[in-house]
Structures are given as structure tokens and as C-alpha cells.
Amino acid sequence: MPNYRIHKTEYIDETKRVSFKYDGKTYFGYEGDTLASALLANGIHLVGRSFKYHRPRGIVSCGAEEPNAICQIGSKKDLTEPNVRATELELYEGLEASSQNCWPNVKFDIGGINNFISPLIPAGFYYKTFMWPKSFWKKVYEPLIRLSAGLGKSPTEPDPDIYDHK
């Protein structure tokens, strides 16, 4: 594991190693790390793609204001959480996270073609482009727009946890 840590801090306990998966690969961090700090310590800088043109994005801050490091947490269909900021998620053993808004992966994203055809898709083009025929909206246009939007995938199965309210 490459170690790109700058210095030791009182918040990260380097005696307690924690393993986690990001985009299917196993990495290691330490207790007290956030997902973002562990990714940077492992040399992972590309963590997402921009919404419209799918340009590469990296971690630019260390708090709740982070615009780029937005991840999908969990791999099961009933226990997954989209749109989690990597800068706010503390590492735990067995964490499974993946990047969002890219296909097939964050390094090679098919949506990156939008960057080359950007003159054809100015701001608000979808408000005028997808108006006709009206019957295409539900079956064709809306699913395509949703696929290209930078949102994570919500759980497809019911929540297996029990919440007892008294």
C-alpha cells in the first residue's frame, strides 16, 4: 500500500488498521480516517465525474462542503445509501463504497463523450430538445436523463432493519 500521509495526527490511530473496498478494490486505512483521507493516503485522487460533462473530479476540501467525493455506500440491494460525502464518512471495517456518476468506472467513463459534444448541449438544452413527441417522455427521454444525472442508486429492496417505535 503506498503511503501518501503527510504527518501523524492525534485523530488517526495508526496502530489500528482498517480494511475497506472502493470500486471493488481493497484498500487499508486507519481508525479515525475518513473515506476521503484514506483514499488520498492510498494514492486515489480521481473520485468522481462532473454532472453534465463527466469531467474528472478529485477531493478539494475536508468537510461537508466537498462537492466531488460523493459515493455510494454498501453493495447489497437493500442496504445501500447513495450520495454520501467521503469527507464525512469515518472508515469502519468492511466498508464498501463506490464512485457515482460514471460508467463503467471512474477512470474510463463513457459519459465523458459529453465533454467533446459540449457545443451541442448548452445550458437548458433538455428543456427544448425533449418536447416532441410527447409519448416519448415517460419511456425514452426521462429514463435517459435520469441515467445521465449524477445521482446514486437508491435501494431496490425493502429495508431489512426493524424500527420499533413505542
Go through the PLM ranges and name each one.
Residues 1-23, 28-31, 42-80:
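Ubiquitin-like/PB1-type beta-grasp interaction modules and other compact soluble beta-rich domains
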Residues 39:
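Carbohydrate-associated surface elements
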Residues 51-166:
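Fe-S ferredoxin-like electron-transfer domains
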Residues 34-36:
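Short, structural beta-strand-to-alpha-helix junction motif
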